[in-house]
Amino acid sequence: MNNTEFYDRLGVSKNASADEIKKAYRKLSKKYHPDINKEPGAEDKYKEVQEAYETLSDDQKRAAYDQYGAAGANGGFGGAGGFGGFNGAGGFGGFEDIFSSFFGGGGSSRNPNAPRQGDDLQYRVNLTFEEAIFGTEKEVKYHREAGCRTCNGSGAKPGTSPVTCGRCHGAGVINVDTQTPLGMMRRQVTCDVCHGRGKEIKYPCTTCHGTGHEKQAHSVHVKIPAGVETGQQIRLAGQGEAGFNGGPYGDLYVVVSVEASDKFEREGTTIFYNLNLNFVQAALGDTVDIPTVHGDVELVIPEGTQTGKKFRLRSKGAPSLRGGAVGDQYVTVNVVTPTGLNDRQKVALKEFAAAGDLKVNPKKKGFFDHIKDAFDGE
């Protein structure tokens, strides 16, 4: 067996995170579960998935598997340099794990019957620019795995109950003897009859087919606070998918996506607005109405205003998520040069130019400009 077979069984890469491995396991475990999938070979696939997950979900076993393959994960080899000592860095996790291997004690093995929280879900909600500024409330509708309403989550047909597994006697695990360089070692593996649940379902529920879960439509109202931005998340506890073995529901994470505005741009609590002025307004000054998310504001444009000039409108920006402070809005001027002038306008501009000195001081050449001129032959 190569050192990637377990990863291949779960359909993940060798660099997969613990969460990616868990999600892949749950998906495949549900797909090949003997109570659901009656196709030939499904049970063997289920056992292979269980074996792979048992190793890859344990950091110590996974490290040994990555280095030595299945033999290392099963305790056949120690860490680097032989047996790696008894400090937990080698193939065994110290004296406790050694005695656990011999006598089937608790050690570091997890209890397969322990309650486990359900999977978290993610939902993207779209907001207008203004909704993100002022906050809003949205109804989120989605489907999730919930407790089966027919069997109340037991997985058993109504009127029947799961019974204690006769092979593992409710433990969910069985002891398996393995030959190693140190001799015969005992380890615990998931029960191949009840698949770690400790109970057998003789008569599966016809709705959920023994899983205890069913896909259900669900909706919840979420309050979007004022000042949110794209990518920020709102956590709704207990609104994810149903847990396992009586564990709690997972959480729902509502991810915000804010639509772009055709007027404004935003960075945090600061809002930006571009103001176009004609050259007469810029030269003589004017009073103009500036749109803000809080309503129009009068802005006095002084004489001689140039392109790039910025004006600050205090407290006309977005609120802080932390409450209290409200940002500012900055107005940036762009002086627009007129095009398509008629004859009268051209004459007027020429007279205007002749009436005074319109020369603009040329930009002073810098060091690199002189070098460029030299190469250009000037």
Curated annotation (Swiss-Prot):
User: Which cofactors does this protein require?
Assistant: Zn(2+)
Q: Does the keyword Zinc apply?
A: yes
Superkingdom: Bacteria
- Where is it located? Cytoplasm
Q: List the disulfide bonds.
A: none
* Keywords annotated in UniProt: Chaperone, Cytoplasm, DNA replication, Metal-binding, Repeat, Stress response, Zinc, Zinc-finger
- Give the CXXCXGXG motif repeat ranges: 148-155, 165-172, 191-198, 205-212
Among PROSITE patterns, the record links this protein to:
DNAJ_1, DNAJ_2, ZF_CR
* Signal peptide (from-to): none
On cofactor binding, the record's note says: Binds 2 Zn(2+) ions per monomer.
The Gene Ontology terms for molecular function here are: ATP binding; heat shock protein binding; unfolded protein binding; zinc ion binding
Q: Where are the zinc fingers (CR-type)?
A: 135-217
What SMART domains does its record include? DnaJ
Any Pfam family = DnaJ
Complex and partners: Homodimer.
Q: What does this protein do?
A: Participates actively in the response to hyperosmotic and heat shock by preventing the aggregation of stress-denatured proteins and by disaggregating proteins, also in an autonomous, DnaK-independent fashion. Unfolded proteins bind initially to DnaJ; upon interaction with the DnaJ-bound protein, DnaK hydrolyzes its bound ATP, resulting in the formation of a stable complex. GrpE releases ADP from DnaK; ATP binding to DnaK triggers the release of the substrate protein, thus completing the reaction cycle.
Recorded protein name is Chaperone protein DnaJ
List the source organism: Streptococcus pneumoniae serotype 4 (strain ATCC BAA-334 / TIGR4)
